[in-house]
């Protein structure tokens, strides 16, 4: 094998991919600027995550965020990184972060046309034990001519123009969903670029894995209890489903996307409105899943149809392979009819 054969000289970077998509759509290039800036933050967070122990970034920063979670030092660093790079992209006007109580309004001289909702470091309760964590983001167009405000972020997920997540695992991967589908990019540390590795990703119609925190079993809705029982003891004597639950949404959803199956964080007696946040956790993941051919629901309605009233609103979420999610929805309907 020659050196040339071992080295791809026509690689598709994320920048090239987005520029090509933008050219097809005759865009202004602002989305490319925005995603390039986001990639810079993801690379920096990836580096910080990998050297967190040496740099003393583990542990608690000594406060809680707006939704009551303890803030870790890496959370603070990641949040500052994402905010600063998005502001300096000159493509955003409103930012919503899990870590900030109020929406961040970008300075007039730096404003663009996009609204970005993000969780800078999802799964951060797992940082200290080295479990995979990630960054989640959803991008909307500002849909009014008024001065930018928090209201610009209160759009249903159907209005998303792009969404995705970065996974800091055995490698750093960025999964990007846009109008034409879902594509996966791997960070090549040798050249510092995200390289397209999976084009137009589609989830399996039916999987063989279910993912839920069964520690809440006594609080579950009867429909969830029945569904899990069916997966463990199939009435048709087929092979039971495997159970996998990491406790880091990015890791659990990415596994579901790759292998198929179902991920559930439903409402329960303790959290009747669900626990995960709609704008920067549920909506982006639901958008990715639907663009990959899957389904995402609360059990009563499509996640992407919810019109938010608060930037930190919570929602139940069930997503995954269409046949698996449909089976659970049928059980919900059966119980609702009783």
From Swiss-Prot:
Gene Ontology terms: biological process: cellular response to magnesium ion; cellular response to xenobiotic stimulus; fructose 1,6-bisphosphate metabolic process; fructose 6-phosphate metabolic process; fructose metabolic process; gluconeogenesis; negative regulation of cell growth; negative regulation of glycolytic process
UniProt catalytic activity: beta-D-fructose 1,6-bisphosphate + H2O = beta-D-fructose 6-phosphate + phosphate
Binding site for AMP: 18-22, 28-32, 113-114, 141
Residues where Phosphoserine is found: 208
Transmembrane segments: none
Origin: domain of life: Eukaryota
Record-level Gene Ontology MF annotations: AMP binding; fructose 1,6-bisphosphate 1-phosphatase activity; identical protein binding; metal ion binding; monosaccharide binding; RNA polymerase II-specific DNA-binding transcription factor binding
UniProt keyword annotation of Secreted present: no
Cofactors named for this entry: Mg(2+)
Modified positions (N6-succinyllysine) in chain numbering: 151
Record bears the keyword Hydrolase: yes
One matching Pfam family: FBPase_C
Residue sites binding substrate per the record: 122-125, 213-216, 244-249, 265, 275-277
Regulation acting on activity, per entry: Subject to complex allosteric regulation. The enzyme can assume an active R-state, or an inactive T-state. Intermediate conformations may exist. AMP acts as an allosteric inhibitor. AMP binding affects the turnover of bound substrate and not the affinity for substrate. Fructose 2,6-bisphosphate acts as a competitive inhibitor. Fructose 2,6-bisphosphate and AMP have synergistic effects.
A GO cellular-component term linked to this record: cytosol
Residues recorded with modification Phosphotyrosine: 216, 245, 265
EC top class named in words: hydrolase
Record text on subunit structure and interactions: Homotetramer.
Note: The molecule has a highly reactive cysteine residue (Cys-117 or Cys-129), which tends to form mixed disulfides (e.g. with homocystine) but is not essential for enzyme activity.
Function statement: Catalyzes the hydrolysis of fructose 1,6-bisphosphate to fructose 6-phosphate in the presence of divalent cations, acting as a rate-limiting enzyme in gluconeogenesis. Plays a role in regulating glucose sensing and insulin secretion of pancreatic beta-cells. Appears to modulate glycerol gluconeogenesis in liver. Important regulator of appetite and adiposity; increased expression of the protein in liver after nutrient excess increases circulating satiety hormones and reduces appetite-stimulating neuropeptides and thus seems to provide a feedback mechanism to limit weight gain.
Membership in a protein family: Belongs to the FBPase class 1 family.
Name of the protein this chain belongs to: Fructose-1,6-bisphosphatase 1
Organism: Sus scrofa
